[in-house]
Amino acid sequence: MADEKPAYTKPLPDLRPEDKPFWEALKEHRFLLPRDDKTGEPFWYPRKYAPGTLGETSWMDASGEGTVYTYSTHFIGPSKAYKGDPPHIVALIDLKEGPRMMTILVKDEPGYPSLDPEDVTIGMPVKIVFDDVTDEITMPKFTPAG
C-alpha cells in the first residue's frame, strides 16, 4: 500500500481524434511531432490539416530536446486543484526539430516536482520527461538537460 501512487486530481487534456497518436506514443514514453506531408516540416500543435498548406499530416519521432525560449512563474494555479502547490514554471520550448511548444518545467525526480524559478534561464537546454499521471494519460514535461 505504501508504494501506491496518489490519485491525480489536476485537469486532464481533452483527447481529440487528430492527436490520438501523440497521446498513445507518450504512454510508450515516445515523443512525436506532427508534420506537413507536402513540406516535411514538423509543427506544433497537432491538428487535422497542416498550417500554411492545409495539406495532409503524418507523425514523426522527435528528440524531445530543446531550449527555453521564455518562461513564466505561476504562483496561483488555473484551478482549485492546484491550491497549496508550490509555484510552477510554464515555458515555451524551442524544440530541436523547429516548432515551439508550451510546457511545464520540472525536476527530474520522482513525482516530477516543479523546478525552482531561480534554476531557469532563457536559452537553457532541456529534455523531455514522461509523467505517467494516470493509466491512460502521460504528460510531456521538460527538465534541464545535462
Region locations from a protein language model:
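A broadly conserved sequence feature marking short terminus-proximal activation segments
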Residues: 1-32
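A short, acidic/glycine-rich surface segment
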Residues: 52-54, 75-80
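Well-ordered alpha/beta subsegment
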Residues: 4, 98, 103-146
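Cys/His-rich short segments
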Residues: 26-65
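OB-fold (S1/OB) nucleic-acid-binding surfaces
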Residues: 83-101
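Short, conserved beta-turn/loop elements at beta-strand boundaries and strand-helix junctions
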Residues: 71-77, 131-133
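Residue-level marker of beta-strand positions
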Residues: 65-67, 125
